[in-house]
């Protein structure tokens, strides 16, 4: 069991788990009924989706062949859920991303979700994809262009900006379309292969 919560991205995250057989009987449109057939499970205790599923199998020993379903979450972004199941990337992010980077990660994930709406299989939530695309936080686009001008190789953009001035970059449609930015602290990311 993993217990070092202070370094986790979502230390208070938990999910309400119900056995699959009970889930099949539920009317999910009925928001009035309080479901009591499940149990809240703290996610900070589990280092992987496998460990989480093993724990859930122990809670509902008769139903261990089919993973349980999750009908409620607390203190975690909704994009970690898919078809009433927890995405395995949650555990990787929770164990390996600091709390100070969660806002940037959430902006990046939500931007992908919006872009790939209807084709969510293309969305990448793993930590390696996050860091591969993360460019930093800047005051504005001009500040970002200044930084790229001073060290173009560092950013590994899909556009060759070697020798370009800040003004040339800002006037270049290719440069302006190779990144996305936003969020509370102006997070900049390479545009995934859109």
Predicted regions and their residues:
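Acidic, proline/glycine-rich low-complexity IDRs
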Residues: 3-13, 29, 149-194
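N-terminal ordered "arm"
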Residues: 1-59
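Intrinsically disordered, low-complexity segments enriched in small/polar residues
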Residues: 36, 116, 134, 161, ...
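Mixed-charge (acidic/basic) macromolecular-recognition segments
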Residues: 53-151
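A residue-identity detector for tryptophan
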Residues: 40, 44-46, 108, 131, ...
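Intrinsically disordered, low-complexity coil segments
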Residues: 23-36, 64, 115-122, 168
